[in-house]
A protein has these predicted regions:
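Extended beta-strand/beta-hairpin segments
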Residues: 1-60, 68-143
Length: 143
């Protein structure tokens, strides 16, 4: 049973489905909004490297959340971002993540001060719901 939404609660949904394929017990689909994503377990655990795995999705969620907050802070300061690409990496030690490292490469129309960018990254990390929910650090390294 799901908790009813309140002013402080929001509910997010994903559908994960396995079609009963006895040949590939790891293959499944994830439906988010209207998009279906072919997924599997991580390649180290016998999964298909051509498909997304839960570990990658966790890293992508942290990266996307950080990026969206960063872009919002830049917009508020009227800084025009031309492009943003993050080569994020999650580090798994045994059976748990120990950190996620974000390495965003960001191109601006003008050259903002490095101190302002550092402030945006710190604020994005503090504002990101995903990072706030993890029990390990999300670090940012510039590229």
């Amino acid at each position: 049973m799901t908790e009813p939404a309140t002013a402080t609660h929001e509910t997010y949904r994903a559908t994960v489905a396995w079609d009963g394929d006895r040949e590939d017990l790891r293959a499944h689909t994830i439906t988010l909004a209207e998009q279906r994503l072919a997924a599997s377990s991580a390649p180290k655990r016998g999964g298909d490297p051509a498909k997304a795995d839960p570990e990658q999705l966790l890293v992508a969620a942290a990266s996307a959340c950080h990026m969206l907050w960063f872009l919002d802070f830049a917009r508020r300061e009227r800084l025009r971002v031309v492009s943003y690409e993050d080569q994020a990496e999650g580090v798994l030690d045994g059976h748990h993540f120990v950190r996620i490292v974000l390495r965003p490469a960001i191109e601006f129309e003008d050259d903002p001060k490095p101190e302002l960018l550092a402030q945006f990254h710190q604020r994005a990390n503090e504002a990101c719901f995903i990072a706030n929910s993890l029990n390990f650090p999300v670090q940012v390294e510039g590229r």
